[in-house]
Amino acid sequence: MTKKPGGPGKNRAINMLKRGLPRVFPLVGVKRVVMSLLDGRGPVRFVLALITFFKFTALAPTKALLGRWKAVEKSVAMKHLTSFKRELGTLIDAVNKRGRKQNKRGGNEGSIMWLASLAVVIAYAGAMKLSNFQGKLLMTINNTDIADVIVIPTSKGENRCWVRAIDVGYMCEDTITYECPKLTMGNDPEDVDCWCDNQEVYVQYGRCTRTRHSKRSRRSVSVQTHGESSLVNKKEAWLDSTKATRYLMKTENWIIRNPGYAFLAATLGWMLGSNNGQRVVFTILLLLVAPAYSFNCLGMGNRDFIEGASGATWVDLVLEGDSCLTIMANDKPTLDVRMINIEASQLAEVRSYCYHASVTDISTVARCPTTGEAHNEKRADSSYVCKQGFTDRGWGNGCGLFGKGSIDTCAKFSCTSKAIGRTIQPENIKYEVGIFVHGTTTSENHGNYSAQVGASQAAKFTITPNAPSITLKLGDYGEVTLDCEPRSGLNTEAFYVMTVGSKSFLVHREWFHDLALPWTSPSSTAWRNRELLMEFEEAHATKQSVVALGSQEGGLHQALAGAIVVEYSSSVKLTSGHLKCRLKMDKLALKGTTYGMCTEKFSFAKNPADTGHGTVVIELSYSGSDGPCKIPIVSVASLNDMTPVGRLVTVNPFVATSSANSKVLVEMEPPFGDSYIVVGRGDKQINHHWHKAGSTLGKAFSTTLKGAQRLAALGDTAWDFGSIGGVFNSIGKAVHQVFGGAFRTLFGGMSWITQGLMGALLLWMGVNARDRSIALAFLATGGVLVFLATNVHADTGCAIDITRKEMRCGSGIFVHNDVEAWVDRYKYLPETPRSLAKIVHKAHKEGVCGVRSVTRLEHQMWEAVRDELNVLLKENAVDLSVVVNKPVGRYRSAPKRLSMTQEKFEMGWKAWGKSILFAPELANSTFVVDGPETKECPDEHRAWNSMQIEDFGFGITSTRVWLKIREESTDECDGAIIGTAVKGHVAVHSDLSYWIESRYNDTWKLERAVFGEVKSCTWPETHTLWGDGVEESELIIPHTIAGPKSKHNRREGYKTQNQGPWDENGIVLDFDYCPGTKVTITEDCGKRGPSVRTTTDSGKLITDWCCRSCSLPPLRFRTENGCWYGMEIRPVRHDETTLVRSQVDAFNGEMVDPFSAGPSGDVSGHPGGPSQEVDGQIDHSCGFGGPTCADAWGHHLH
């Protein structure tokens, strides 16, 4: 039985049975009802009524309301909407009846109505302004005018207009103007938000609001990523964290491509740790360190020590930004040379980009179908951007016919924020350098530049291209002279200084010019490509809105990741670039060598401090007053044995004054391990114990430990089972990694022959040792020594040793030996044969019939992988075979390129094993590599220069070089194997094919060149010495066959050897007489022509030769088939039918050599007709560099 709560409820403080209604404010209740309806909750009739209200007012209903509308059943909706229709009909009838009654009223009421209408017009006129636009009435309104009907009195009566635009704000620069069409009675408005009932008018209003900014486009401009700068830089690049992401991607790629090495690194990391946490950390660190060895060269100390030989009079320095060099030489004071600042002034503005724009004064002119094309008068103003189009017109928007009407919209473009690019002129760069002497520097004067200058111990000076040399007086220390080459610093032609907001960056020139943003030049005020920061929205019948994109500053900053940040105001401080100087020390002298030794007691004013560069600074206080006197200071290994160890950086330190308690700073370099710094003599001697971490052997073993941690990751090389040597290479790679560092530290100064002999000696001692442990130690050490002495291990980059005529790429050696022979230890390999086979298949389907190799190493690569490619093609049912023919003459170019693909062919173990023993059968279709040009595969259908070096790998007998497909099409040679150097009076341009040597003797001139083969790519400007202002007609080795565009590639009396014997093998170009011949200079000699061999077809020697204005000794080419002279040197009176001439022509087939306009068949020593002479030998009608000859330079050899 349920108990009712009636009784007990009476005695409660609050009677639950007699509670009143909740006290809610009426407006709050109305708000709750409306909000619930907007959310789609409530009676169906109310929901439909609210949707009808939104429909009549041209407002957008909420998503929840639309969802409820779609959920209503059809019968229920039709029932309510029919009742709405009946109610609307009743209202229409009532209005019609009211209109008839008003017409029957008298004149007094009519006058009252007229006065009321006039008052309304006057009230509206207070807010609305009327003017003219395009010959029609223009009304300017604000957001208060759109609530009711706008009545405009005209000569034809009242013109009532309705404006239902939702973007009306207050008047500002952001205005929009468009037409309100006339709608006849009974036509509903369609695709218009403004209309009138009597005549068309234009409406204008501002779009600004006081609560938010103007409407802007959601679209953004795509800005290409700048990428990492190629400059060596002392400061961090902008947004350098992007490198971390790329490095993680590289690590992942390395693990996928090197599963065996990754497993080995993980095993080593697991063995190193004593618990699971340490094991995980060590494993992650090893995997992260592994690919770093081939990432790039990182870490560079900002202080280097240079030791001059005894009696040296000069030393070459290379100063970089924020670097310091300490120069020590026997019998000379120690100098510190510091690059203080690199500054460029008077930057020239190149181009400005707009990254934030505003759009104002929008106007639209529309026409009905068949009434002509719309034309906006503002199109004539260059500050406006216009766009024409078509819209749907008809009765609902003021046109009598249905169809497409013309529309023309214009908007004014103005730039709010811009990024400015400026170029640096080489002549405006100045280098501020300071020189400091390690003399009697007191602690008060240390770092005090003005005090050191007063003591003639320091000097600052500025080096500019106009003043590259300076002599400094250093008081009693003598004087020092610096001859510098400012042009060897930053390549100003490749970079711009770009200022975005308050930040400035050093950006690549090509990236800057390719930015997809509006731009203008300094001499113009008009912006180009303005539409990139504007968006014309979808056009309506008579209206089209235009909005500007938001600020692109954030996108620019993100794209600039990797660029170098610089400081710019009126000048820019550079942190990149270098300055090469020759420091002449012949007039430097030590000060105080005749002083006596100090006899009183010294004390350490402060404890000796480590400088971080392996040296220690000691501040001494001298109690005596017998100065100036020399300081007896030495570093010893033991106090019982006073034999000096280490060395003094401050040469001949002395106390300069006679005042007591004077303080002096001395810098010295103690040995590794424990030592004592001893100051003074006899019983007044003091000492300080010093420990320098590490040792010579310890440093070697620490390097070995790092090598073990990097563990066989010299390049991004795959775990390669493609050849039988792959497994052995990986073992050798591990040996190199673990012991390579110690090997270079301990034996790096010896020749490889000495290293090999030491290894053989240790092996012999191991074989003959009786004790097993000693025997194993000798055998292991000797084996590692022999292996590391004979193998070629890899690094990245190329270096040149001019004196030994040696070029190293990685640690592989490319030697030009004394007998003029090339010995190369390089082996080119594709990234993977599977992907290369797919690339070949794809290229063949696209109409590429073959390839031309760029170099002999690429040709050898095709030969090496031919069979494996053919097996892959056969296994994947592709009727195609790769055929490699012997190259003929020089390596020619071709117009097409191979394109990259992510797809790969697959091959099983059985097919791979079979490919080692048997070559596959030839298919019906062929892909031809090199060989002579044939009708089946002409050069115009071949690909060339499609590969570039990705990384240097490892090999026991050769350095592996991994190739990948180029992403861009270029004619330049691969810069990864190019090295350039200048040392003393010798300059060299070199790669794996060329050794081009120039010497300085009054002027720079080409001395000799040795060619492993002749190729048809162009030498990149980034690896060219002294390349500014060079005319290609003066280049002896033509630019079209990889001749450097350098002033080192010139020689007085000779022009470009475009018709030299470049199709011969084993070419050596030098300046000497061919055996058994003589050359005379005479004006009666013939003009330039193709190079001629000094022996005829039958082997007869031609002894007499001449030239018009060449320099002697003459230019000659030594080849496997004989000796040839240059184009300026002609045979004297010889039967031309027996001459052997060069068939090479570096120009287009329709052109002639611009330096020899005589008869083409006349190559002998008589003049050959009237001609105009220039420099005694040049003869051409077009004039040097004239319009008809301008294109002669730059055609590739085909």
Swiss-Prot record:
The record marks 105-106, 127-128, 219-220, 294-295, 794-795 as: Cleavage. Pfam families: Flavi_capsid, Flavi_E_stem, Flavi_glycop_C, Flavi_glycoprot, Flavi_M, Flavi_NS1, Flavi_propep. One of its GO terms (cellular component) is membrane. Disulfide bonds join 297-324, 354-410, 354-415, 368-399, 386-410, 386-415, 484-581, 598-629, 798-809, 849-937, 973-1017, 1074-1123, 1085-1106, 1107-1110. SUPFAM superfamilies: E set domains, Flavivirus capsid protein C, Viral glycoprotein, central and dimerisation domains. InterPro entries: Env_glycoprot_M_flavivir, Env_glycoprot_M_sf_flavivir, Flav_gly_cen_dom_subdom1, Flavi_capsidC, Flavi_capsidC_sf, Flavi_E_Ig-like, Flavi_E_Stem/Anchor_dom, Flavi_E_Stem/Anchor_dom_sf. GO terms for molecular function: protein dimerization activity; structural molecule activity. Genome polyprotein: Specific enzymatic cleavages in vivo yield mature proteins. Cleavages in the lumen of endoplasmic reticulum are performed by host signal peptidase, whereas cleavages in the cytoplasmic side are performed by serine protease NS3. Signal cleavage at the 2K-4B site requires a prior NS3 protease-mediated cleavage at the 4A-2K site. Glycans are attached at residues 142, 448, 924, 1001. CDD domains: Flavi_E_C, Flavi_M. The chain crosses the membrane at residues 110-130, 254-274, 280-294, 747-767, 774-794. Residues 392-405 are annotated as: Fusion peptide. Residues 106-127 form a propeptide. Keywords: Capsid protein, Clathrin-mediated endocytosis of virus by host, Cleavage on pair of basic residues, Disulfide bond, Fusion of virus membrane with host endosomal membrane, Fusion of virus membrane with host membrane, Glycoprotein, Host endoplasmic reticulum, Host membrane, Host-virus interaction, Membrane, Secreted, Transmembrane, Transmembrane helix, Viral attachment to host cell, Viral envelope protein, Viral penetration into host cytoplasm, Virion, Virus endocytosis by host, Virus entry into host cell. The keyword Membrane applies. Residues 2-15 are annotated as: Interaction with host EXOC1. Residues 1152-1177 are annotated as: Disordered. Residues 37-72 are annotated as: Hydrophobic. GO terms for biological process: clathrin-dependent endocytosis of virus by host cell; fusion of virus membrane with host endosome membrane; viral translational frameshifting; virion attachment to host cell. Residues 2-109, 275-279, 768-773 are cytoplasmic. Residues 131-253, 295-746, 795-1198 are extracellular. The keyword Thylakoid does not apply. The transmembrane domains of the small envelope protein M and envelope protein E contain an endoplasmic reticulum retention signal. This is Structural polyprotein. The lineage of its organism: Viruses, Riboviria, Orthornavirae, Kitrinoviricota, Flasuviricetes.
